[in-house]
Amino acid sequence: MENPTKYNSNELEYIKRVLNAESWSATSGTWCQELESQFAKKFDSKYAVVMNSGTATLHSALVALGVGPGDEVISPALTVIMDTTATIHANAIPVYADIDPETFNIDPKDIERKITDKTKAIIVVSLYGLPCEMDEIMAISRKHGIPVVEDNAQCFLSKYKGRLVGTMGDISSWSFENSKHISCGEGGIITTNNEKYAEIARKIAGHGYKNLKANTGQIKLNQSVYQDPDYKRHSEIGWNYRLSEPSAAIALAQLENIEKKVELRKAIADMFLKEIFDCDYLIPQKTPKYSNNSYFTLGIRYEGLKELGVSWQDFREKYVSFGGDGFYGAWSVPYLEPVMQTRRFTSRCPDIYKGISYSEGLCPVAESIQSKLMQFKTNYRSLELAKQKVLALKKTIDFYKETK
């Protein structure tokens, strides 16, 4: 089985068509519109708005929900910093909820504990491709009247109790960054069934042009109107988050092949999981029976220091020596990053962040697990290459079994 991680479908053909077209911009081309149409259909949504990154989609989603200065946004303590930066770009206050120690996803009970009268939105991240506990989360959302943003940057086609991830929150955000299931180098998209949210997000992504609508990123006006010196264009403060037509063409071709991409990542993850089945110090992310995992990466909690007396770093070094290509440590919990500890971000709205503390111990489960996580790749180009890495892991496990 070959891995369609980069391209092996219509990408090249679509790029040729873009190069032969008159416009490479979303404002007048057709590829961004087609990508939005097909993505909305695939993920059972009324509206889709494509943008140039997953961070842009998160920021636009928060603004569409009305998040602004002094509001609080709850997000998980174990994830990349982009949920935090999107919150800060909305001039809001990041609030962190701890995680479940087995699934590594946000803990609904801690979400509820962190809600205040300032909470304006909740971001939930389907970490590594595993859906969050959406029934509990949406019950909390309805109880308190707080909208939910699904950050599905790492999660494509996973299901939770039979429902497709991306169809349960108020807005869903996706990423087309280089390592994701769908990749066009950089890119992202939001989906929603709410026309108001889609229209605001569209305007935020398109310089705030007043004629942009939920279902189109193009402005169709008579030349005599928009060329008139008295014509007023902008109803919102917006950014240029538009995706280029070449990038949209690549992403569309990738979308057409998404089932195969997810299938292969699952197959590779299964190979690793079988190898560690009886290993008591390599504990994989727990996937509940009512969910499936699209395995953006395979997350494993390492307890070898306690069980073997072998550090995370030494285990990784041995794995590499046997032919493994290394595995990644999990990102530092966002609030312990230097930018948060030195509070450099507060210069934007200093009064808003007075008295806000992000000290160590804020989310103890996430802090404890983060340093133990191993993130094994699942986007190898072929099963044969993946088998070599699985064999390297087997040799590493066997080595420490013999020396134990």
Predicted regions and their residues:
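PLP-dependent aminotransferase-like
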Residues: 63-152, 159
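Phosphate-binding glycine-rich loop
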Residues: 25-72, 83-89, 95-98, 163
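Short, conserved charged micro-motifs
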Residues: 306-314, 382-388
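Basic phosphate/pyrophosphate-binding loop/patch that engages nucleotide-derived ligands
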Residues: 115, 138-147, 189-210, 310, ...
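Active-site region of PLP-dependent enzymes
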Residues: 23, 155-161, 168-297, 332-335
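N-terminal "arm"/small-domain region of PLP-dependent enzymes with the aminotransferase-like
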Residues: 1-25, 375-377
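Conserved PLP cofactor-binding pocket of PLP-dependent enzymes
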Residues: 209-222, 271-276, 289, 316-373, ...
